[in-house]
Amino acid sequence: MTNIRKTHPLLKIINSSFVDLPAPSSLSSWWNFGSLLGVCLGVQILTGLFLAMHYTSDTATAFNSVTHICRDVNYGWLLRYLHANGASMFFICLYLHVGRGLYYGSYTYSETWNVGILLLFAVMATAFMGYVLPWGQMSFWGATVITNLLSAIPYIGTELVQWIWGGFSVDKATLTRFFAFHFLLPFIVTALVMVHLLFLHETGSNNPTGFPSDPDMIPLHPYYTIKDILGFLVMLTALAPLVLFSPDLLGDPDNYIPANPSITPPHIKPEWYFLFAYAILRSIPNKLGGVLALVMSILILAIVPILHMSKQRSMMFRPLSQCLFWLLVAVLFTLTWIGGQPVEHPYIIIGQTASVLYFLIILFFMPMTSMVENYLLKW
């Protein structure tokens, strides 16, 4: 008798994606982040759904409704802090996932990579709009500053900003539409995840060596499902103490002050996971130039496959490229630190230097180093 999981129209799709999927036998723990991101997305949708049952998207009551969730709803504080810190965990996994792709040359699967970039933009948009919802000081001013950047677009900028605001300033209409989009976008993200997996399963997974792994494949279940479960437990071990002991560690204290359009906070900054892009934005004195640099800091990932000059796919056997990769990581940490600092000397020049280095490493140094390594291979 044939197994039902191989014959049932629905089960056979799940089977070919999560059970009998052939996977390279050499996958390291860096391949765990895809499944961790799936878990993060599930947790965010579930906690967000229950939070939405108690939240009101009105400027007069939004702040109080979040307070009500934390104080009066059964385990509301847990839902709220799981959702807020779950977003941080989501971005940690997301950045590590992208970093893994850069290091091991996974970007050569261009369809999967490009859908991944779309996913990154969608998740960033979702997180930005979610940060506005508690309607604290940083929510309001963050929304004002970031949406105002669109006014740098020639001709249509001002009208575009007012169209997004639904008026002449960030107000009730803005909050309502941000809530609507914040609720909708995770489902669009889920659909994009399915497309991402569809393209990935067309080619099969990359592996740490970068060599074709067709002769040496193993089924995903039980080998990698067990490995993924270990990954979930490790992530939970990191997330639980954060949520239960230091839930506000990664947040901004200003967001516990209700939004006040007449008082500007001394330092307006986004959540920590956007600080690197915010530092790049601030490092350029011109508004339009800053906005372009901000968009390019993420969009540059789309041209990484074109810039791949090496004869080897992975960086595993390319020590010079490895040094550059870790320099890029150091630059990103520096940018994240600078993004949270006030705009004054010496932070300005450090931010500008790090921003220039970020683009130089990706656009110039990495391709050049690859060509040097290709030359050294002939020796």
From Swiss-Prot:
Per UniProt, heme b b566 binds at H97, H196
State the UniProt keywords alphabetically. Electron transport, Heme, Iron, Membrane, Metal-binding, Mitochondrion, Mitochondrion inner membrane, Respiratory chain, Transmembrane, Transmembrane helix, Transport, Ubiquinone
The record's GO CC annotations read: mitochondrial inner membrane; respiratory chain complex III
Q: What transmembrane ranges does the database entry give?
A: 33-53, 77-98, 113-133, 178-198, 226-246, 288-308, 320-340, 347-367
Sites binding heme b b562 sit at H83, H182
Subunit architecture: The cytochrome bc1 complex contains 11 subunits: 3 respiratory subunits (MT-CYB, CYC1 and UQCRFS1), 2 core proteins (UQCRC1 and UQCRC2) and 6 low-molecular weight proteins (UQCRH/QCR6, UQCRB/QCR7, UQCRQ/QCR8, UQCR10/QCR9, UQCR11/QCR10 and a cleavage product of UQCRFS1). This cytochrome bc1 complex then forms a dimer.
Reported function: Component of the ubiquinol-cytochrome c reductase complex (complex III or cytochrome b-c1 complex) that is part of the mitochondrial respiratory chain. The b-c1 complex mediates electron transfer from ubiquinol to cytochrome c. Contributes to the generation of a proton gradient across the mitochondrial membrane that is then used for ATP synthesis.
Q: What is this protein called?
A: Cytochrome b
Which organism encodes this protein?
A: Artibeus toltecus (Toltec fruit-eating bat)
